Amino acid sequence: MAEKATQKDRRGALVRAAYSQIAERGFEGLRTREVAREAGVNIATLHYYFPTKEKLIEGVVEHAMERFRTTLAPHGSPADQLRNHLRSVRRLVQDEPQLGIVMGELTLRSARDPGIARIMQETNEAWHHIVRGLLRRAVKEGNLRSEMDSDEVAAMVVATLRNLTLPMASSGARGDQALRQLERWIGVDGSSRGSGRKHSSN
């Protein structure tokens, strides 16, 4: 048990060091030897846990998504959970600007790196699955309009939240404005309830 805990600690230290480097220097500034030194291990130990740089990036993305998962509260109705998720993501990226910087760097890199593109796509699909599940449950319970296409709406929610993690969008009134409009459009702004309500297209 102690050895497993030590391995987990070492792996976590390496991931956090890589995460910090990307936030401070960008993806191009990520150096595995410096990551190992910052984590207090040698380069051989880093390669034991992360044989390739792509595996290290997977660890960084998982660390970032763990932060996003803290915004998913299990209490309340599905509609309440979705509204809280939207608002909590907004607060999270404002409180932890490194998170948006890291995700932005990796998103940009994914356009030129198939390995990172795969990692980011898998992350998007997992997030989409969670949001779609909340939407479907909210429709089933009568909290949202019955004609809602949960898959398409989930795609819009995830795209909006991903955009709000970017540094330029994570602060200022426009981000808040976009989030409020998204809540109203979906029907989770708390102003009304029931599957029969109508939404204006204006």
Predicted regions and their residues:
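Generic hydrophobic, amphipathic alpha-helix propensity
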Residues: 7-19, 35, 60-64, 68, ...
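Hydrophobic/aromatic residues within well-ordered alpha-helical segments
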Residues: 10, 53, 60, 64, ...
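Solvent-exposed, amphipathic alpha-helical segments
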Residues: 13, 17-25, 67-71, 102, ...
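Helix-turn-helix
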Residues: 13, 21-55, 59
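Short coil/turn segments at alpha/beta junctions that flank glycine-rich nucleotide-binding fingerprints
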Residues: 24-25, 96, 141
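Hydrophobic alpha-helical connector segments
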Residues: 59, 70-100, 150-157, 176-179
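Amphipathic alpha-helical segments used for helix-helix packing
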Residues: 94-118
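Hydrophobic/aromatic-rich alpha-helical bundle segments in the mid-to-C-terminal region
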Residues: 116-121, 125, 139-189, 193-202
